[in-house]
Amino acid sequence: SVGFKAGVKEYKLTYYTPEYEVKDTDILAAFRVTPQPGVPPEEAGAAVAAESSTGTWTTVWTDGLTSLDRYKGRCYHIEPVLGEEDQYICYVAYPLDLFEEGSVTNMFTSIVGNVFGFKALRALRLEDLRIPIAYVKTFEGPPHGIQVERDKLNKYGRPLLGCTIKPKLGLSAKNYGRAVYECLRGGLDFTKDDENVNSQPFMRWRDRFLFCAEAIYKAQAETGEIKGHYLNATAGTCEEMMKRAVCARELGVPIVMHDYLTGGFTANTSLAHYCRDNGLLLHIHRAMHAVIDRQKNHGMHFRVLAKALRMSGGDHIHAGTVVGKLEGERDITLGFVDLLRDDFIEKDRSRGIYFTQDWVSMPGVLPVASGGIHVWHMPALTEIFGDDSVLQFGGGTLGHPWGNAPGAVANRVALEACVQARNEGRDLAREGNEIIREASKWSPELAAACEVWKAIKFEFDAVDNL
């Protein structure tokens, strides 16, 4: 007779362990689970733990050749979600041995790779991860981080200003470089390739890189400030991506860019290592994130994607605005902004932070606010995001009635006015409009911008509320 009992047994008998004491080395996950009708939450939570670790749908005799107790994921706590029927937060602990060191790719393949199509679940969302110190230390993280970036750029005590060059597609390389020059000359710190500017027939990447480098050097010479343009190195193959990054380094520019979700974590981590070794800053765009993070009950919350990016490596990442055209609830946005920038973040459910996270001195990432913002938003942005951020105005620069350079001037004046007002102890939330109006009295460029955008609002209810 065989030495094990074949057949299908309930997951919860093996994988639901409410008495388990989590270890400091465990990776912890908080899943929002919506079971199918008739499936008890313990079984659903245990199924998630099983299918994302050692389990399969039936008992297999090779289980006897290893120690399941050592390697299995465990659902150790379940709580109902307030105000939602049939939704539960299931906490799962994974032993660290299940994961390859320094690989975000492997971490996600394990934790979210298979389990989201599971039939016993109606929907599943990964809300947060706790990355243990032992695992954090296997990653190099951001190529440089916030402090080193400020030192490289010699810019302190204020947010940095950016602008995405529009129209995003269709300009020739020379006209593109001209727009870059005008924005940098007017007072911005950075300009940006749009996420889908790679190497298209109307503008091949090398032509763009050369004209943008020329624009950067010309603007630096005329302003005495260090300037940058996020040259998008994203490409169809990793080899081609690295070729573009090498070209950027040879041109002596300070920063390149990558679309980390469409490009993939493996490519991103390779690029981050190259940037660290060669003194390039790395700007990260999150194109495709809403496919993954928009639904409340299914997918992955952006805070998980943000944590993963900090591990994989990037110096800037787009993080919503709280005030513009793209979604973002204030407290929740600030929660993952802190996860990107700070060294130690306390658990705080009101901000969507399910676990205390210690980054043990891994460099921080600058959050980038962009999407439908303009000069009237400047006081709110300065107050919400603080100094360690990049504020990016695409249309809010290039849409200025007098042209690109005056648009840049308007944003720089508005920013400097807000920072000065804050440093003098004024309340940006209450006096914001007043501060902008005062500044516009001596800056005709700002006055013109204020007039154009005085009535623009993108007001919809946020999708993501706790």
Curated annotation (Swiss-Prot):
Its cofactor is Mg(2+). Binds 1 Mg(2+) ion per subunit. Coiled coil: none annotated. The modification N6,N6,N6-trimethyllysine is found at K5. Mg(2+) binds at K192, D194, E195. It is an enzyme of class 4 (lyase). GO terms for molecular function: magnesium ion binding; monooxygenase activity; ribulose-bisphosphate carboxylase activity. The active site is at K166 (proton acceptor), H285 (proton acceptor). InterPro entries: RuBisCO, RuBisCo_large_chain_AS, RuBisCO_lsu_C, RuBisCO_lsu_C_sf, RuBisCO_lsu_fd_N, RuBisCO_lsu_N_sf, RuBisCO_lsuI. The modification N6-carboxylysine is found at K192. The keyword Chloroplast applies. The keyword Amino-acid biosynthesis does not apply. Pfam families: RuBisCO_large (PF00016), RuBisCO_large_N (PF02788). It catalyses: 2 (2R)-3-phosphoglycerate + 2 H(+) = D-ribulose 1,5-bisphosphate + CO2 + H2O; D-ribulose 1,5-bisphosphate + O2 = 2-phosphoglycolate + (2R)-3-phosphoglycerate + 2 H(+). Substrate binds at N114, T164, K168, R286, H318, S370. The record marks K325 as: Transition state stabilizer. GO terms for biological process: photorespiration; reductive pentose-phosphate cycle. Its EC number is 4.1.1.39. Heterohexadecamer of 8 large chains and 8 small chains; disulfide-linked. The disulfide link is formed within the large subunit homodimers. The basic functional RuBisCO is composed of a large chain homodimer in a 'head-to-tail' conformation. In form I RuBisCO this homodimer is arranged in a barrel-like tetramer with the small subunits forming a tetrameric 'cap' on each end of the 'barrel'. This is Ribulose bisphosphate carboxylase large chain.
